[in-house]
Amino acid sequence: MLEVKELKKSYGDLHVLKGINIQVNKGDVISILGPSGSGKTTFLRCLNFLEPSDDGTLIFDDETYDLKHIHKKQIASLRKKTGFVFQNYNLFLNKTALQNVTEGLIVARKMNKKEAIEIGKKALDKV
């Protein structure tokens, strides 16, 4: 389960996220909808620690994290357990589709290349 409590983010006097609360259970698939500029991307960037949060609590895998004071080691550990699809995706143009799919498994998850290729091929067969 993933739970976020009172997530806050401001840029100077502009309060973008004002105490966001959400709970996502294992197996849930969710969509975040809203007009342009409503904070959807900022919310996801804060959840993936691509941008610092001003305040809030994250509960993931029965562990509680203070989003304002989270440590780099905690961030690295959480990133190994989560995924993030960017609004504007970026591919390595000099690599094949399979190489793009397996890159994260090999680099971030330290998976051996053979296993990553097997998983990558299965994923590509689905699209």
Predicted regions and their residues:
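ABC ATPase nucleotide-binding domain signature
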Residues: 81-82, 86-90, 95
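Helix-to-loop junction immediately C-terminal to a conserved catalytic motif
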Residues: 48
